[in-house]
Amino acid sequence: IHGDNKTRKGERKLHEERWQAASAAAHQHLSTPQTAAGGGRVLREVTLEMPIRYAPSDAVEKWLNNLLCLDCGSTPNRIIGGTPHPRECELYYVDRDSLFSYHKLSESFLQRIMALYVASHYKNQPNDLQLLSDAPAHHIFVLLGPQAEGQGNAGQLPDVLCVVQVALEGEISKESVAAQLSRGQRASGDLIPWTVAQQFQDNEFAGLSGARVVRIATHPDVTGMGYGSRAVELLTKYYQGELASGEFEEENEAAKPADEESDDESNLLKEKVKPRKALPPLLLPLTDRPAERLHWFGTSFGLTLQLYTFWQRSGFRSVYIRQTANPLTGEHTAIMLNALKCDDLPASPAAGWLDEFVGDARKRFMALLAYEF
């Protein structure tokens, strides 16, 4: 959703035009007799190309950049399968064991995902890659076109139209919430539950289960074509149990690969790191994976008109806007929620529970318009 490849190309072209104009003006200024005698200013552009940590063409630097996806580039692979209608595209779950197996195709697919993050102006660090690889609550979904299966059968990687990173949050006990809020503290993680509980002094919301969109990035060649909205729509249906049959259950022993050792037999001191013999499929249709049933679907982002409009069109409603702006971006952090259909869940909240948060947040925002916003 964020970022536009055409905009970046335009910025580079504008920089080159300004540089050429400034250089021509400087040469003309120096060529005149009046300025040539008295001296003049010379315009120079300095570019740093010498590595500051490694020697030139050091193999360790190349290996490290590939391992941490630091050199995936800001321009993703070109889309070769065309631009299908969003309604023809489907969302797939990415198995992280296969994604981070360092298999040749899996590694190329990971590089494509990280390239989309870079193109969408997300700040990527090695810690973000580690969080993506082994954080239990994080999941990755990709939106693919109808030709994805044909590309896979031909041994080609499918075109990634949109990638969504989701973190499961909530299900915090009332006792833990009350104890943390009474001390003016909050545990790490669970951004939306803790923020809402702290702002509204509500211990009930933190006990609900939900999912937060950590990152969502659309391929820069197809921004504004509805692929991001399609991905959010399918995720909403998925977490409402409308796409997959059954509910999510932890993997049992029978579901483990044959080469995976049990917890009793494994020992970190004796474990031998080796390639796995059997890997699960990299991409799994949502219809083949039971969903985690949730009460809400949310997002937190730096507030802009474009992003607010996007999430509002997807059925999300604003419940929190931070009073102070981010010192780096100058944007106010916003939280928007979408109440999912969860009447069949045992601990489902009363109907219209989100309306109370939205109404209270709107009153606060109106009262602070003359001050902070």
From Swiss-Prot:
Its EC number is 2.3.1.-. InterPro entries: GNAT_dom, NAT10/TcmA_helicase, TmcA/NAT10/Kre33. Keywords: Acyltransferase, ATP-binding, Nucleotide-binding, Nucleus, rRNA processing, Transferase, tRNA processing. ATP binds at residue 53. It catalyses: a cytidine in 18S rRNA + acetyl-CoA + ATP + H2O = an N(4)-acetylcytidine in 18S rRNA + ADP + phosphate + CoA + H(+); a cytidine in tRNA + acetyl-CoA + ATP + H2O = an N(4)-acetylcytidine in tRNA + ADP + phosphate + CoA + H(+). Its main location: nucleus. The keyword ATP-binding applies. GO terms for biological process: rRNA acetylation involved in maturation of SSU-rRNA; tRNA processing. It is found in: Nucleus, Nucleolus. Signal peptide: none annotated. It comes from the Eukaryota. The keyword ATP-binding applies. Gene3D superfamilies: 3.40.630.30. Residues 246-271 are annotated as: Disordered. GO terms for molecular function: 18S rRNA cytidine N-acetyltransferase activity; ATP binding; tRNA binding; tRNA N4-acetyltransferase activity. Acetyl-CoA binds at residues 216-218, 223-229, 313. GO terms for cellular component: 90S preribosome; nucleolus. Disulfide bonds: none annotated. PANTHER family: N-ACETYLTRANSFERASE 10, RNA CYTIDINE ACETYLTRANSFERASE. RNA cytidine acetyltransferase with specificity toward both 18S rRNA and tRNAs. Catalyzes the formation of N(4)-acetylcytidine (ac4C) in 18S rRNA. Required for early nucleolar cleavages of precursor rRNA at sites A0, A1 and A2 during 18S rRNA synthesis. Catalyzes the formation of ac4C in serine and leucine tRNAs. Requires a tRNA-binding adapter protein for full tRNA acetyltransferase activity but not for 18S rRNA acetylation. Belongs to the RNA cytidine acetyltransferase family. NAT10 subfamily. This is RNA cytidine acetyltransferase.
